[in-house]
Each structure stands twice: as C-alpha cells, then as structure tokens.
Amino acid sequence: MKERGLLIVLSGPSGVGKGTVRQALFAQEDTKFEYSISVTTRKPRQGERDGVDYFFKTREEFEEMIENNKLLEWAEYVGNYYGTPVDYVEQTLESGRDVFLEIEVQGALQVRKAFPEGLFIFLAPPSLAELKNRIVTRGTETEATIENRMKAAKEEIELMDAYDYVVENDSIELACERIKAIVLAEHLRRDRVAPRYKKMLEVE
C-alpha cells in the first residue's frame, strides 16, 4: 500500500527568505521533495529563469488558467498574480512523492481550504526591522513598494494562526533543519502509517 505524498506549504511575508530557504533545502542531497513551480505575472528578477524559478506568464495567459481551473490557488499581490498549477501537484502526491510549495500567504490560505491535510509552515523573520532590511538590500524595490510590502507583512504575520508550524528564519541552515525535522515527524504520524500496518495484518 503506497503512502500518499505530503503537500508541504512554506509561506511567509515578502522578504523573509522563502526562496533562499527553499533553494538551500533543495541543494541538500537528502532532500526528497518535488518542487512545484509557481506561475506568476511579475517580471523576472536578475538570475531567475522561466520554468525553473517560476513560470512567467502575461496577465491574459494567467486569467485563462483561472477560467479553465488549472490553478490549485492563485492570488494577486502588489499588482501581480501568483498561482500553483493543480495537475502537477495531484499527480505527484498520488505517486507517493512529497510536493513542496513556496507561495504567498494569500495562496497558502486557499490551499488550506482545498487541502486541509497539507503541512503548513510559516517562515517568520527574526524582527520587522530585519525584514525591512532584507527587502531594502534586494535593491529591486522602490520606497513606495517597500512600504507596501511592510504593511502587507504585518497583516500576514497576524495570519500565523492558520499554520501548523512556525519556523524562524534567523539562520538559513537552522531553518532548513527545522523544516526537515517537521516533515520527518509528519511522515511518522500514527494516522499516516497505521493503515499500512493494518493492511499488513490482513495479509498475514
């Protein structure tokens, strides 16, 4: 009896380091997650590649995906759309592999409704001052955009109660270790492993 994969959702405020932590996790040899690439209408940042970091789409293309129910979740954030392609997620979970989503908070709340059995991890900054510093250091945002992101971040931190776990990103290495420990523990939950053992007893 093949165990269905876990849907692991990592989200948190803009600038908290979701992408950096995800890249560090996937660079480790013992990471066995399948990364679900999000679709977005925002412009690529320096070094980002289409089909690797995101699927970059026009607003028209994205809205067509919404109409055709091709997205597990989608949200508009600071003037851009973000979403998760549904077919890939479902097929991967059925094959027994874990799917890792790195998405915005609005999107994570939608996924929570569609996949309540998912594993929801909130990546938190050590402080709001550090969060602002990380956004400013990017060098890609205007002052107005930075203020909008900070306002949104405060609202998103208040939504922490919708998550199963909170991981502080005070160190990328420690954040990765905490996430791996959470996933390991979830795979050992009685309600996930008991059916396999009960099936084994039936065969005996």
Swiss-Prot record:
One of its GO terms (cellular component) is cytosol. It is found in: Cytoplasm. It comes from the Bacteria. Its EC number is 2.7.4.8. CDD domains: GMPK. ATP binds at G12, P13, S14, G15, V16, G17, K18, G19. Pfam families: Guanylate_kin (PF00625). Its main location: cytoplasm. SUPFAM superfamilies: P-loop containing nucleoside triphosphate hydrolases. One of its GO terms (molecular function) is guanylate kinase activity. Keywords: ATP-binding, Cytoplasm, Kinase, Nucleotide-binding, Transferase. It catalyses: GMP + ATP = GDP + ADP. PROSITE patterns: GUANYLATE_KINASE_1, GUANYLATE_KINASE_2. Signal peptide: none annotated. Residues 5-184 form the Guanylate kinase-like domain. It is an enzyme of class 2 (transferase). Essential for recycling GMP and indirectly, cGMP. Belongs to the guanylate kinase family. This is Guanylate kinase. It comes from Bacillus licheniformis (strain ATCC 14580 / DSM 13 / JCM 2505 / CCUG 7422 / NBRC 12200 / NCIMB 9375 / NCTC 10341 / NRRL NRS-1264 / Gibson 46).
